């Protein structure tokens, strides 16, 4: 986060363009760096399946955070419909939303209904509608990683992030040569 914010605060040509299109682009760079933390500390794996495991990890992380993101969206929709809600009512709504989303998207896989696990994220109240940026950030990350192959990551980051706060697709066009798209079955 600090790398992105430092670059987009000090290296963007126009002050009004400082920043990124959304926090999904901040999260994307954080994900890029998180992947490199253990190798930087000397923990290197030569596992032939590492790339496949990484793809599975990204998929699973996205699947998990998408459920929480839906709880966030449903909860804020409920709050706008109930502006005088009390804290106990809000708590009930969050739990109800979490169970509804769990039952629709997770229970068929896990075989357990009415779980409230998706209600545990405090981000949804602390930082409204921030959570949906995580899955979008994984899509951006995937395309950035493809762009970084065979290149020096730091140089690419310094080339891409000073673009500033453009529309998401224009930013992606400059960064990777195309719009943000989800590619199934490979990068």
Residue ranges of predicted features:
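C-terminal, non-catalytic "cap/extension" segments appended to globular domains
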Residues: 32, 61, 65, 69-187
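Post-HExxH zinc-binding segment in Zn-dependent metallohydrolases
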Residues: 18-58, 137, 165
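Short, glycine/acidic-rich hinge or "gate" loops at secondary-structure transitions
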Residues: 11-18, 43-50, 150-156
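Residue-level detector of alpha-helix boundaries and kinks
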Residues: 15-18, 56, 122, 129
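Short, surface-exposed loop/turn segments at secondary-structure junctions
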Residues: 14-20, 84-88
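Catalytic Zn2+-binding segment of zinc metalloproteases
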Residues: 1-14
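Histidine-centered active-site/metal-ligand motif
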Residues: 1-4, 27, 76, 123
